[in-house]
């Protein structure tokens, strides 16, 4: 079962098969049902048809190893749907290595606004250092107007630029920032960072955006 025990009731059709030294598990997971039942900003939240959830909430984890195994995640999404994490991309897979699923951070799934912002690699703006680009993925869940989403993205870009100039490069090679609208809030509210296999950040923002 996924690491969060509350997820067990949302797993169905679990089948485990062994062949040629490999074990394959197939199952269905009701992500919307899980999000509605838990609805915690530290675990999983849903706005419209988009979900921000810890990877440990819905992904099965191999057990019985002396050290955490490397896990490659390949995701196929339907038309208009997206998937993103803070994990590095290796070919067509998102790779988790050196840590367990419990510390893998947030994932963004479903119908939401996903944008990628190119950022300089950590330390790459220092004299004599090799140049390179990383990526800041920004996932905005439903609840903010189109104009408001543009204002939020501009705010994120300007903040990332300020951090880049201060640290002479961005603070991570890749990062996922999930922005979760809260109708009762003004401005920026609660935020949470999960490092692990790839840094992810969840920030609650007011549904009404004030560009000031």
Feature locations, PLM:
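A surface-exposed beta-strand-loop module
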Residues: 1-43
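Solvent-exposed beta-hairpin/edge-strand motifs
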Residues: 1-11, 70-89
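Extracytoplasmic
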Residues: 9-11, 20-22, 68-70, 133, ...
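C-terminal beta-strand-rich structural cap/linker in extracellular carbohydrate-active enzymes
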Residues: 17-28, 93-116
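Edge strands and adjacent loops of beta-rich recognition modules
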Residues: 45-57, 100-132
């Amino acid at each position: 079962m996924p690491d969060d025990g509350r997820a067990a009731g949302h797993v169905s059709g679990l089948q485990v098969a062994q062949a040629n030294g490999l074990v394959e598990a197939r199952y269905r997971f009701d992500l919307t049902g899980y999000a509605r039942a838990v609805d915690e900003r530290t675990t999983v939240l849903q706005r419209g048809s988009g979900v921000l959830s810890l990877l440990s909430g819905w992904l099965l984890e191999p057990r019985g190893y002396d050290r955490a195994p490397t896990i490659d995640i390949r995701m196929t999404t339907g038309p208009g749907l997206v998937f993103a994490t803070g994990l590095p991309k290796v070919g067509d897979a998102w790779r988790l290595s050196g840590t367990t699923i419990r510390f893998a951070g947030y994932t963004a799934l479903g119908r939401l606004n996903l944008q990628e912002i190119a950022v300089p690699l950590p330390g790459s703006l220092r004299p004599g250092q090799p140049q390179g680009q990383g990526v800041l993925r920004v996932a905005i869940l439903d609840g903010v107007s189109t104009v408001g989403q543009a204002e939020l993205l501009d705010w994120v870009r300007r903040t990332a630029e300020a951090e880049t100039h201060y640290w002479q490069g961005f603070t991570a090679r890749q990062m996922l920032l999930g922005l979760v609208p809260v109708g009762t809030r003004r401005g920026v509210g609660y935020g949470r960072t999960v490092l692990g296999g790839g840094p992810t950040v969840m920030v609650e923002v007011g549904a009404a955006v004030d560009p000031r």
